[in-house]
Amino acid sequence: MMLQIPDVLSKAQVAQCRQMMDVADWTDGNATSGHQSALAKRNMQLPEGSPVARQIGDLIQDALGANATFFSAALPLKVFPPLFNRYEGGQAFDNHVDNAIRYLRGTGFRVRSDLSATLFLTEPQDYDGGELVIEDTYGQHRVKLPAGYMVLYPATSLHHVTPVTRGARVSSFFWIQSMVRDEGQRALLFELDTRIQQVAEEMGQKDSGVVGLTGVYHNLLRRWADA
């Protein structure tokens, strides 16, 4: 399941992030690459653990914690601290699959990457190219979203970023370990939760059908989740 989530960050929050990022020091993006990715990756990245990366990462994590759609879709158990990249001057990232396990350097923290996320921090009209292209059994999906919007997709997906030929594409990217490992079960729970909310708006939270379906949702979550 691929999902676009609007307004994870407000325009004011995006501007605040960009103000800090635009004066920060950037390094070669291969600092966080695995072997396969290092052969495919051409971009710049904020150093992992830098004060700017930590400050903006905390802001993003707070925003995710307040976003009901993100929680319903991802059912997050762990979120890898957000990283930040920049593409310009023809830079791109060829087809690859993200590493299954991500380690936070210098700590014992690790995340199984069930879901990948890209949070756009540049308006689409400010650069050419730079589309995130995600492949699944239905074909290719080309993603280029407004600043503050996020795309969430299975970390098992082949994906690439097309060359940026004008301007610069700045974004945050990170991985989520879900309480529900199985993608199909997770998608079913998200669909069920969404439908329950729709019925509740029409019938009210105290409607017996809403109460019953909510019980079904939680019992399925109890059966499938690791917490």
From Swiss-Prot:
The Fe2OG dioxygenase domain, residue ranges: 78-178
Residues involved in Fe cation binding: 96, 98, 159
Binding positions for 2-oxoglutarate per the UniProt entry: 169
Keyword vocabulary terms for this entry: Dioxygenase, Iron, Metal-binding, Oxidoreductase, Vitamin C
GO MF annotations, alphabetized: 2-oxoglutarate-dependent dioxygenase activity; iron ion binding; L-ascorbic acid binding
Cofactor dependency: Fe(2+); L-ascorbate
GO biological process, one term: DNA damage response
Top-level taxonomic group: Bacteria
Enzyme Commission code: 1.14.11.-
Cofactor note: Binds 1 Fe(2+) ion per subunit.
Protein known as: PKHD-type hydroxylase Reut_B4660
Organism of derivation: Cupriavidus pinatubonensis (strain JMP 134 / LMG 1197)
